[in-house]
Amino acid sequence: MQTYFLTSDFPNGFPEAFITALKQTIVRQEHFVFAASSFDKAEVNEKYARKIMDMFAAAGFHFQTLTILDDRLPLAQIDQVLEQAGVIWLAGGDTLAQHASFERIGLREKLKKTTAVLIGMSAGAINMGDQIVLARHELDN
């Protein structure tokens, strides 16, 4: 059985209730996968992956490895990385860019096979769905 968390941003770190739920759910802390929202922005992805890892460390989680799923990860390695993951974090950010990248690599189908805890934040939570509705903001082009 898969476990999903759908979240918004955490500007003040993880709240205690979320930490408690994570501690009851996460059993494997070897491998953490951070699925970026903009696969082509390596520097930004590094920054936000580190921020999330720091919040996990502050909550008492210490993963042995971090893999950032973006354009730097060879397609041939994605299945193995997902199979080894204890937690897969789907980042917030550009919802449409993330959706396009997920479609390109077939990520949503791959996630259906994982035993990892899946956490979608903002755009990542939206992109976990099979049917995605994203209303355009009036200021969008």
What label would you give each PLM region?
Residues 57, 89-90, 117, 121:
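Generic detector of intrinsically disordered, low-complexity, polar/charged segments
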Residues 97-141:
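Class I SAM-dependent methyltransferase SAM-binding "motif I" and its flanking Rossmann-like core
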Residues 10, 38, 93-95, 123-124:
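Short glycine-rich anion-binding loops that position phosphate/pyrophosphate groups of nucleotides
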Residues 85-99:
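Short acidic, glycine-rich surface-loop motifs adjacent to enzyme active sites
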Residues 1-87:
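N-terminal beta1-alpha1 cap of cysteine-dependent amidohydrolase-like domains
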